[in-house]
Amino acid sequence: MSRSLGRLYLVATPRPDQPEAEFLARVEAALDGGVDTLQLRCKAGSPQYGEARPYIALARRVGALAQARDVPFFVNDRVDVALASGADGVHLGQDDLPAEWARRLAPGLQIGLSTHSPEQAARAQAEHPTYFAVGPVYATPTKPGRAAAGLAYVRHVAALCPAVPWYAIGGVDLSTVDDVVAAGATRVAVVRAVLDAPDPARAAADLLARLPDAWEARVCR
């Protein structure tokens, strides 16, 4: 099923020491607060979800939360987990399986792509993904060792007015989101700003309130 992309995209990553019930409760709260696109990202080598079967089991539980709210659900990197869990799509990084190969393996999956430079953004648009991500806007511990692409990269992509939806990602939170929107982003993706907040539902609602409305998110500014 193809679900409409939203404006506030949560990349949900369980901590190594986090009980699954707590993780699921925080994801559910974030969805209730307004997260309208969701990705599950389990890091390679995770002691809990490094193997396919536990990753698939968690993806099915997270996907059920998204499906109940008609929110599009993506799995990071793993085409096999996305297929086995019934996800809407898979998100692929620059070092992951090429989008063309993913389409051959799973023609029905939507595809999201990470980009970190104008050249990568141009290539991403040529591959016709469901969406692509632009960042990291700011340095973030989620991607250690990766230099920030900065607001200049957001402005560059916004000026292109891509036909493909795109999300600004990397260090986006309540202290930075206004600058990211001013640079031209109408959609943002977050990790810690929502999932690590004391109240994920409130954090999501507060971020969503700072984004352009759904109609503006469909047009260039």
UniProtKB/Swiss-Prot annotation:
Residues that, per the record, bind 2-[(2R,5Z)-2-carboxy-4-methylthiazol-5(2H)-ylidene]ethyl phosphate:
140-142, 171
Provide the residue positions that the database annotates as binding Mg(2+). Answer: 77, 96
Q: Which domain of life is it from?
A: Bacteria
Pfam families to which the protein is assigned, alphabetical: TMP-TENI (PF02581)
Q: Which reaction does it catalyse?
A: 2-[(2R,5Z)-2-carboxy-4-methylthiazol-5(2H)-ylidene]ethyl phosphate + 4-amino-2-methyl-5-(diphosphooxymethyl)pyrimidine + 2 H(+) = thiamine phosphate + CO2 + diphosphate; 2-(2-carboxy-4-methylthiazol-5-yl)ethyl phosphate + 4-amino-2-methyl-5-(diphosphooxymethyl)pyrimidine + 2 H(+) = thiamine phosphate + CO2 + diphosphate; 4-methyl-5-(2-phosphooxyethyl)-thiazole + 4-amino-2-methyl-5-(diphosphooxymethyl)pyrimidine + H(+) = thiamine phosphate + diphosphate
Residue ranges the record marks as coiled coil: none
* GO cellular component term of the entry, any: cytoplasm
Instruction: Report the record's Gene Ontology biological process terms.
Output: thiamine biosynthetic process; thiamine diphosphate biosynthetic process
Annotated residues that bind 4-amino-2-methyl-5-(diphosphooxymethyl)pyrimidine are located at 39-43, 76, 114, 143
Free-text comment on the cofactor: Binds 1 Mg(2+) ion per subunit.
Protein's job? Condenses 4-methyl-5-(beta-hydroxyethyl)thiazole monophosphate (THZ-P) and 2-methyl-4-amino-5-hydroxymethyl pyrimidine pyrophosphate (HMP-PP) to form thiamine monophosphate (TMP).
Q: What is this protein called?
A: Thiamine-phosphate synthase
What species was this sequence derived from? Deinococcus geothermalis (strain DSM 11300 / CIP 105573 / AG-3a)
- What's the encoding gene here? thiE
